[in-house]
Amino acid sequence: MLGVQAQKPPPGQWTTPPFDPRFPNQNQTRNCYQNFLDYHRCVKTMNRRGKSTQPCEYYFRVFHSLCPISWVQRWNEQIKQGTFPGKI
């Protein structure tokens, strides 16, 4: 039987995002998109207030865990070009 130390993930490894009651269904596409928006809104708000963006790291970890890399890259390119359809 494995000990408690052997069951812990190594440092720096991602864990599964916790359950979000806003998205109870198996399809997590909307959850991915919403956490991407929440992260960018959080960073924008914290920068505007001159505070640390550390509280925004939760949203970053969740959307990086749920979203395909190609989606995130496309959304970031759209943000840079000013063509992103979401409200940030």
Curated annotation (Swiss-Prot):
Distribution of this protein across tissues and organs: Testis specific.
Function: Component of the cytochrome c oxidase, the last enzyme in the mitochondrial electron transport chain which drives oxidative phosphorylation. The respiratory chain contains 3 multisubunit complexes succinate dehydrogenase (complex II, CII), ubiquinol-cytochrome c oxidoreductase (cytochrome b-c1 complex, complex III, CIII) and cytochrome c oxidase (complex IV, CIV), that cooperate to transfer electrons derived from NADH and succinate to molecular oxygen, creating an electrochemical gradient over the inner membrane that drives transmembrane transport and the ATP synthase.
Biological pathway: Energy metabolism; oxidative phosphorylation
Broad class of the protein's primary localization: mitochondrion
Protein name per UniProt: Cytochrome c oxidase subunit 6B2
Compartments reported by the entry: Mitochondrion inner membrane
SS bond list: 32-67, 42-56
InterPro entries found in the cross-reference section: COX6B-like, CX6/COA6-like_sf, Cyt_c_oxidase_su6B
Residue positions of motif Cx10C motif: 56-67
Membrane topology per record: Peripheral membrane protein
Higher taxonomy: Eukaryota, Metazoa, Chordata, Craniata, Vertebrata
Motif (Cx9C motif): 32-42
Subunit relationships: Component of the cytochrome c oxidase (complex IV, CIV), a multisubunit enzyme composed of 14 subunits. The complex is composed of a catalytic core of 3 subunits MT-CO1, MT-CO2 and MT-CO3, encoded in the mitochondrial DNA, and 11 supernumerary subunits COX4I, COX5A, COX5B, COX6A, COX6B, COX6C, COX7A, COX7B, COX7C, COX8 and NDUFA4, which are encoded in the nuclear genome.
Gene Ontology BP annotations: oxidative phosphorylation
Lineage top rank: taxon: Eukaryota
Region annotation Disordered: where it falls in the sequence: 1-26
GO cellular component: mitochondrial crista; mitochondrion; respiratory chain complex IV
Annotated source species: Mus musculus (Mouse)
Pfam families in the cross-refs: COX6B
Domain annotation CHCH: ranges: 29-75
UniProt similarity note: Belongs to the cytochrome c oxidase subunit 6B family.
Record keywords, A-Z: Disulfide bond, Membrane, Mitochondrion, Mitochondrion inner membrane
